[in-house]
Every structure is written in C-alpha cells, then in structure tokens.
A protein has these predicted regions:
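Interfacial helix-start motif at the membrane-water boundary
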Residues: 43-60
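Outer-pore turret/helix-boundary of cation channels
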Residues: 57-85
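Membrane interface segments of multi-pass transport proteins and intramembrane proteases
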Residues: 30-42, 139
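Helix-boundary and loop/linker segments of multi-pass membrane transporters
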Residues: 1, 39-45, 97-101
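Membrane-water interface of transmembrane alpha-helices
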Residues: 17-33
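Transmembrane helix-loop junction
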Residues: 27, 31, 71-72, 128
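Pore domain of cation channels
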Residues: 8-14, 18, 81-90, 95-139
Length: 144
C-alpha cells in the first residue's frame, strides 16, 4: 500500500510538472505568429529549438523526482546512480545494469509507463506546433 501511494504521488507530481510546463509554453506561444510571419527561417528553427530544450528540461525534472525518491528510500547507492536508473527507466531504454530491490521493482514499471505517456504528450505538443508552422507556410506559399 505504501509503494502504491509513492507511485501515485510521483505520477501526480510528474503530471503537474508536465502540465505547468506545457501551459507556460502555451502562454508563450502567441509570439509564434510573429515568428511564422518572419521571412527568416532561423527564427522558426530557433523557436523549435527553444520548445525542444524546454520539453527536455521538463522530462529531466520528472526523472530527477523519481531518482530522488529511489535514492532517499535507500534503493540506490547514490544520486548519480539513481538519476541514471531513472533516466533509462523513464525513457524505457531499461539497460538492466542497475535494478531496484524486490519490493520496489513495480515502481520502475510505473515510472516507465509514466514516461511513455508524458513523452507522448510532449510529442503531440511538438507535432501541433510543427503542424501550425506547416499550415501557415502552406497558406503563404499555396493560397489556392
């Protein structure tokens, strides 16, 4: 029961981080119109680069949340190992060279599921931005 509560708390924290980060990006995105209307391609590339960096930072924050819990619970020997384990688990790479103890293994699976869903959310968000750029380009270059 305790581990289920830990998992639920971490999942909720990750959703809060992801939501807050995406909402901040959405708040910032009205400036996209001026980027889209700019004749300079480098501004569009710069916009995408900023979005990608921001999204990677959001996911790294989530990875560190999981890692901190694993480290504080004494499941992993140091924070560096915990971050490494959490990163390969969250991204579902799962090398298997670092593992949790029997009681905590299920949390690794939940972290992986959380990562899949939230990375998917980020992918959908980036797709929406790129689609918006494409639609704008199409209207300008192929108005028919």
């Amino acid at each position: 029961m305790y581990l289920a509560l830990v998992a639920l708390t971490l999942l909720a924290a990750c959703v809060i981080v992801q939501s807050a980060g995406i909402l901040l990006l959405i708040h910032w995105l009205p400036r996209v119109r001026e980027v889209l209307e700019s004749p300079h391609v480098y501004r569009r590339v710069g916009l995408l680069l900023r979005v990608f960096v921001w999204i990677v930072l959001l996911h790294l924050i989530q990875v560190v949340l999981w890692a901190f819990v694993f480290f504080r619970a004494g499941e992993l020997p140091n924070l560096e190992t915990a971050v490494y384990f959490s990163l390969v688990t969250y991204t579902t790479i799962g090398f298997g060279d670092v593992v949790l103890g029997p009681g905590w293994r299920v949390l690794a699976g939940i972290e992986g599921l959380t990562g899949i869903v939230l990375i998917g959310w980020s992918t959908a968000f980036v797709f929406a931005i790129v689609n918006r750029m494409y639609e704008h380009w199409r209207q300008v270059h192929d108005p028919a």
